[in-house]
Regions:
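Bilobed "Venus flytrap"/periplasmic-binding protein-like clamshell domains
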Residues: 54-91, 153-225, 230, 297, ...
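A ligand-binding cleft/hinge motif common to bilobed small-molecule-binding domains
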Residues: 113-125, 134-138, 227-254
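A structural signal for short loop-to-beta-strand junctions that line the ligand-binding cleft
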Residues: 127, 138-160, 259
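A bilobed periplasmic-binding-protein/Venus flytrap-type ligand-binding module shared by bacterial periplasmic
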Residues: 159-169, 265-279
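An extracytoplasmic/periplasmic, membrane-proximal ligand-sensing/linker region
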Residues: 54-56, 66, 207, 282-329
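Short, low-complexity, disordered segments immediately C-terminal to signal peptides
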Residues: 14-15, 25-49, 53
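Sec-dependent bacterial lipoprotein signal peptides
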Residues: 1-21
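Acidic helix-start/capping segments at beta-turn-to-alpha-helix junctions
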Residues: 88-106, 113-118
């Protein structure tokens, strides 16, 4: 079950953003971007010229488009609110993310609730489709590492199993149950951690009694689409908010998770306790406010602009912030 911020929380966050806007300077040159998804067409608030006193914020972005967009959204909103913030590009896997927190190279990053829990509990299968329940299990594990989970968004990005329209039509596959019945010999292309990820090969084995481990090809996220289109693999794992899923010309079929294997991978800001302790509500108001606005449909559209339309992450972030009345670049 996707967790939606309560009305009381939303009112508080909107009020907090009004205070941020009121505190901003008088620079009339700030312009809104030319549109994100599902927006109200608002303009970005003017940014403050005052600086927050405290440690610099280093935001970790993993090497895929969605992470780059989210990192830009965080960075631009924080910079507008007077924080010294920058982005550090990391590798594509969660062990590098946590290593960067441990070393102090980063102190903030966008991440995903269920995947974060399963990484820290050694893929014990504790994550559920209820984000509140999953977050309750995650919180003490983060505390042990000196980290804190801020408010998760409504936006969910979990694993998505896709085949080409041709494969779907030929074999009659539209669900993961169909894949288990008719696709045991198909080749699966996914990131290397699919072998241990509870929402990939182990999940297919546990929930669908489907073992594709012998037909598994480890691939970087970035090459999976081309590998699928070219026939090098038969089934590809992409993010459920992959922008190509919103493009009818892609020619993919998203296989329905009809037995609910996948869990609550809501996007949330992951921060060091040192960072939240230094800035308190000044920091969390900005980040929680972003989470209160972000939806799955919007994130999918933002990814389409990056992956299909080839827009830059910083421009995508700027227009999304403007559409939601949150200060940006």
């Amino acid at each position: 079950m996707t967790r939606r911020p309560t009305t009381r929380l939303l009112v508080a966050l909107l009020a907090a953003f009004s205070l941020v806007a009121a505190a901003c300077g008088d620079d009339d040159d700030t312009e809104a971007g030319d549109g994100g998804s599902g927006s109200d067409g608002g303009e970005a608030v003017e940014c403050t010229e005052d600086s927050q006193s405290g440690p610099a914020i280093s935001i970790g972005a993993q090497d895929f488009g969605e992470s780059a967009i989210l990192a830009e959204i965080y960075e631009q909103a924080l910079a507008c609110a007077g924080f010294e913030a920058g982005i550090q590009t990391l590798g594509g896997f969660r062990d590098l993310l946590f290593g960067s927190f441990d070393s102090g190279d980063i102190n903030l990053a966008p991440d995903y609730v269920a995947s974060n829990l399963e990484f820290l509990n050694n893929f014990a299968g504790e994550a559920t489709s209820d984000v509140d329940e999953t977050l309750d299990k995650l919180t003490p594990l983060l505390e042990d590492k000196g980290l804190v989970a801020l408010e998760p968004s409504e936006a969910v990005d979990t694993n998505a199993f896709v085949v080409t329209q041709e494969t779907s039509d030929e074999l009659g596959i539209t669900t993961l149950s169909d894949l288990a019945d008719k696709g045991q010999d198909l080749t699966l292309g996914a990131p290397p951690d699919c072998e241990t990820n509870g929402f990939c090969i182990p999940g297919l084995q546990r929930v669908y009694d489907l073992d594709l481990s012998e037909n598994f090809v480890p691939l970087d996220f970035g090459v999976i689409p081309a590998s699928l289109d070219e026939g090098a693999i038969d089934v590809g794992v992409v993010g459920s908010t992959d922008g190509r899923l919103a493009d009818p010309d892609t020619g993919w079929v998203l296989l329905e998770d009809d037995q609910q294997m996948l869990a609550a991978d809501n996007v949330f800001p992951l921060a060091s306790e040192e960072l939240t302790g230094a800035y308190g509500d000044d920091l969390t108001t900005v980040l929680d406010g972003i989470s209160a606005e972000l939806t799955t449909d919007e994130l999918t559209e933002l990814n389409k602009r990056f992956d299909v339309d080839k827009e830059d992450a910083d421009a995508i972030a700027e227009s999304w912030l403007a559409d939601h009345g949150i200060g940006g670049a």
